[in-house]
Amino acid sequence: MKIGLIGCGKQAWKHIAGLGNEEDVETAVCDINTDRARAIGEKFDLPWSDDVDAFLADDTLTAVNIATPTLTHADLVMRAVEAGKHFFCEKPLCRHIDDSRRIRDGVVEKSLIGMVGYVYRYSPVFEVGHALSGLDVPNARPLGAPVAASFRIGGRGDHEVWKHRQESSGGAISEMMVHMLDLAIWYFGPVRSVQVVSCELLRPLRHIAGVDVRVDAEDFVLARFEMAGGLQVLIQADLVTPAFSQFVEVQFERGSFMGSIQNDYPSYVFSTEAADMYPEGKTPLRFGTINLFERQMAAFCEHVRNDKPLERNTIDDSLRVMEALEMLRQQ
């Protein structure tokens, strides 16, 4: 099958590598910047185009992979849906809640597969946390019901100017917090209400690509989310942490879960008493280094290949994230 990548910026390499692991997948690339499209096409010996309309009209394309700035997502995704193409799109799905609902309706109407890149769902350590949360099987909670949870993700930013500008939907919320918000929704269900504790711009001057630039999007945010079941969840995200930092901590009635994609962070399950596969005390969680993006793309390709509805990272999951973001931005 043939999958078309739209967007030949810095993320293109990882998308091409992820698709390249699938033996039956042929990749083509497109970017409105002719030089970028040509450079990536020639670098990886792939067919390339700088005409998005012609690219989407190509009947040989089974699906498209959208790796462009957030501001462009709604238009490109909807055009892909109208063309009858399955799609993978970098997070977040789009900028406005109305667009996300329109996309969702189109996906359902045409029976398409639409996946958004919330890659943390494909981390084995966070799969453990999801199982413990018991959202899917409430009666199978070895540690009991969740009592409190906190999520953190921080990075330095400074990769591209648009990621720090409000007009292009940049900032710590869209770039960082959405990942942890999606995990929280996967663990505990939809968000009922939001309270912003802090939303700040701490570094208005950035050094990006060798140039000092003024930016205006928030780079630090802390918010409290009340989930549908009443659980209170704290999420902190920023673009001011020099060395990337990420973890999830959930307290249950009879134990704790601590997880991170970073091998130098402690990941474990603590149980106050023996329960299912967990003995009393601390059980370390060690999975080594895993390419989450490749796992995610393999899942997308499998579902497209077999015309099989998604069970994880569904379009409805992405809509729930967008609904929570709408509540957050109304604060």
Where are these regions (language model features)?
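N-terminal Rossmann-like dinucleotide-binding module
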Residues: 1-44
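Contiguous beta-strand/loop segments that form the cofactor/metal-binding neighborhood of enzyme cores
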Residues: 182-265, 297-309
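C-terminal helix-rich "cap/oligomerization" subdomain common to oxidoreductases
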Residues: 5, 24, 63-66, 101, ...
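Predominantly a Rossmann-like dinucleotide-binding segment in NAD(P)-dependent oxidoreductases
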Residues: 120-213
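Active-site loop of classical SDR/Rossmann-like NAD(P)-dependent oxidoreductases
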Residues: 32, 284-298, 313
